[in-house]
Amino acid sequence: MDAKVVAKISDLRKTSDVIIDSHALTREEYGMRAIPFSAHRLSALQLDALLVLRCDPEVLLDRIAADRGGRREMSVELAREIQLLQESLCLSYAVLCGCHFYAIDTTTKTKAEVKSTALTILSKIGMNIIK
């Protein structure tokens, strides 16, 4: 994340809440790759919370099969590992930032239920959420 992005987010936060959608972990031909944000840049974002969406690995594979979107095949174990690494990275960010961390289990939830859960969480930590 470069300084321009941090500056833009800081500017936007003056007038509204900001949600950042990040996929910090990627699957590469050789394995996994994460290019973590520096502690300085994370601190500059002044994050209030980190939310991770997760589900049972079998459900993740079913969702990928329904909408491949260029994603490669993977095993149940790899799907589980990717999610655990992503959750771990986000938890590390939360610890560095001193902010809340939530992992929302989407296994049995509809998109509307996931949205409602996320908005409820953000509301409870004091964000001005318009539903």
Give the role of each language-model region.
Residues 67-74:
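Short glycine/proline- and charge-enriched loop/turn segments
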Residues 23-67:
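ATP-dependent NMP and nucleoside kinases share a basic, alpha-helical "lid"
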Residues 8, 39, 86-89:
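A short, acidic, amphipathic alpha-helical segment used as a generic capping/interface helix at domain edges
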Residues 1, 74-84:
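A short acidic, glycine-rich active-site loop
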Residues 1-35:
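ATP-dependent small-molecule kinase phosphotransfer cores
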Residues 18, 48-51, 100-101:
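Hydrophobic beta-strand segments of well-ordered beta-sheets in folded domains
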Residues 88-131:
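NTP-dependent small-molecule kinase module
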